[in-house]
Amino acid sequence: MSKLVINNLDLYYGEFHALKDVNLDIEEKEITAFIGPSGCGKSTLLKSINRMNDLVKNCKITGDITLEGEDVYRQLDINQLRKKVGMVFQKPNPFPMSIYDNVAFGPRTHGIHSKAELDDIVERSLKQAALWDEVKDRLHKSALGMSGGQQQRLCIARALAIEPDVLLMDEPTSALDPISTAKIEELVIQLKKNYTIVIVTHNMQQAVRISDKTAFFLMGEVVEYNKTCQLFSLPQDERTENYITGRFG
């Protein structure tokens, strides 16, 4: 079942045509990877899904993005959308507050103020992010004192606290060491039991390890979209083969 449908999407930054007639069906409770060289449009599309491009000057979008049949730009207001679609960025970005308050920030924003309820949400979210056992005795210490890998898992917990349907991840391990990267990858695989996940990655081995489907972007176009095992073992487009075999990129 398709969770997200992207139909005939074009995006312009002024005169620059950043996304060109993008069409993708993203399945529920699967991990979909976006790969491609820098500047190919993969992060631009990710940010279009939860309307982070709204504040970009001279950004124009045509076409449709629907989430469970509702048009992201025409039927959902921004608060509804951000509750349904969580985002994790390339560089860990914990807020300058306690671990507890980082996770509770979203629920409080959406009107939850009961301490008992917030306690439950914080514990559940940190457990989902495989972080609870490491921080349960220092919840009220600053999040800025955590390691980089812990900070990124905290950012994942913060995104999960509002119980989104979709989790967007923009190169979530690119700033992390190999051990922290492995922990995040294991976590992402576990999370797909409950969430639809879209991940942008420059690491093709990572896409192979964790994703169910992969879309290859080049110069604003989706060149190929297929099951990950098929795209990497038997690409249908010569440009895909050239990219995954290292001939460019």
From Swiss-Prot:
Task: List residues binding ATP.
Answer: 36-43
Sorted keywords for this record are:
ATP-binding, Cell membrane, Membrane, Nucleotide-binding, Phosphate transport, Translocase, Transport
* GO MF term list: ATP binding; ATP hydrolysis activity; ATPase-coupled phosphate ion transmembrane transporter activity
Q: Which domain of life is it from?
A: Bacteria
Alphabetical list of CDD domains matching this protein: ABC_PstB_phosphate_transporter (cd03260)
**A GO biological-process term:** phosphate ion transmembrane transport
Pfam families, per the entry: ABC_tran
Q: What class of enzyme is it?
A: translocase
For this protein, the Enzyme Commission number is 7.3.2.1
Q: Which InterPro entries match?
A: AAA+_ATPase, ABC_transporter-like_ATP-bd, ABC_transporter-like_CS, P-loop_NTPase, PstB-like
Q: Where are the transmembrane segments?
A: none
Q: Which reaction does it catalyse?
A: phosphate(out) + ATP + H2O = ADP + 2 phosphate(in) + H(+)
This protein's major location comes to membrane
**Annotated ABC transporter domain residues:** 4-244
Outline the subunit composition: The complex is composed of two ATP-binding proteins (PstB), two transmembrane proteins (PstC and PstA) and a solute-binding protein (PstS).
Spell out the family assignment given in the record's similarity comment: Belongs to the ABC transporter superfamily. Phosphate importer (TC 3.A.1.7) family.
Describe its function.
Part of the ABC transporter complex PstSACB involved in phosphate import. Responsible for energy coupling to the transport system.
Under what name is this protein listed? Phosphate import ATP-binding protein PstB 3
Q: Which gene encodes it?
A: pstB3
